[in-house]
């Protein structure tokens, strides 16, 4: 089991945790979780020079969906199925680490999808949860709060981005995972009028930073690349 570290301040300049485990798909290997000044985490296999591909998953707030928080709505069900399909497609393209900013909408949905895959078919998949602050779920509905803590319990790694009370902590968490990512998967309706929400600002940040961004339309269920596409480098 991977140790999890929760921080409210910047991590040490360099901290490394090495351990060995047996994998069903590989011989014994060494998994290195490392933290540098950019708080970059990764996994390397012993004897290999293997690039780690990370995907940040972001999306508009639930109240901006036609169904709001009603996850039993057929539209929400279809969107979550398509989100799962896109996660698996990115996995096929070499992404092994998925990063979420722990919001109560797309971030939570994606985390539950990744944790489900890890438990059933893909134990080498990893989920990294970047919490905006330690009281993130305090005011959430009880059923969402329960799922939030289950998500954290099952994930690979937890990191707290900001102290409690930091302005725009959710946006800072979005920016953090985008900075760490090779590709962004964003559930977003580009036809909606622009707002100053953290989700919209995060989407704009991903595009402006030239990170390959795959936009999944929540109603049309179409997926289109904004800017360049994601092409994994071959070792």
Which residues does each PLM region occupy?
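Compositionally biased amphipathic helical and low-complexity segments enriched in hydrophobic
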Residues: 18-19, 25, 66, 217
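Short, positively charged and aromatic/hydrophobic N-terminal segments
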Residues: 19, 25-39
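Acidic/glycine-enriched connector segments
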Residues: 45-234
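Cationic, amphipathic, low-complexity segments that mediate targeting or membrane/lipid association
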Residues: 6-12, 17-18
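Intrinsic disorder/low-complexity segments enriched in polar/small residues
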Residues: 14, 20-23, 42, 49
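Detector for intrinsically disordered, low-structure N-terminal pre-sequences
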Residues: 6, 39-42
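Residues at secondary-structure transition points
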Residues: 10-13, 36-37, 65
């Amino acid at each position: 089991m991977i140790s999890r570290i929760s921080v409210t301040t910047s991590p040490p300049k360099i901290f490394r945790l090495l351990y060995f485990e047996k994998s069903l798909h590989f011989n014994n290997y060494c998994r290195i979780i490392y933290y540098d000044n950019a708080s970059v985490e990764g996994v390397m296999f012993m004897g290999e020079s293997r690039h780690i591909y990370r995907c940040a998953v972001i999306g508009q707030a639930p109240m901006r969906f036609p169904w709001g928080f009603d996850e039993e709505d057929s539209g929400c069900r279809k969107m979550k199925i398509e989100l799962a399909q896109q996660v698996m497609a990115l996995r096929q393209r070499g992404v092994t680490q998925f990063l979420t900013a722990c919001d109560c909408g797309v971030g939570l949905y994606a985390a539950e999808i990744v944790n489900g895959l890890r438990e059933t078919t893909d134990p080498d998949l990893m989920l990294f949860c970047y919490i905006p602050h330690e009281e993130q779920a305090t005011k959430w509905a009880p059923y969402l709060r329960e799922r939030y803590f289950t998500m954290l319990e099952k994930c690979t790694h937890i990191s707290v981005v900001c102290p409690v009370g930091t302005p725009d902590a959710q946006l800072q968490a979005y920016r953090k995972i985008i900075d760490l990512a090779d590709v962004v998967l964003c559930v977003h309706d580009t036809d909606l009028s622009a707002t100053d929400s953290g989700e919209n600002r995060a989407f704009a940040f991903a595009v402006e930073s030239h990170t390959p961004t795959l936009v999944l339309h929540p109603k049309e269920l179409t997926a289109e690349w904004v800017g360049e596409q994601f092409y994994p480098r071959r070792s």
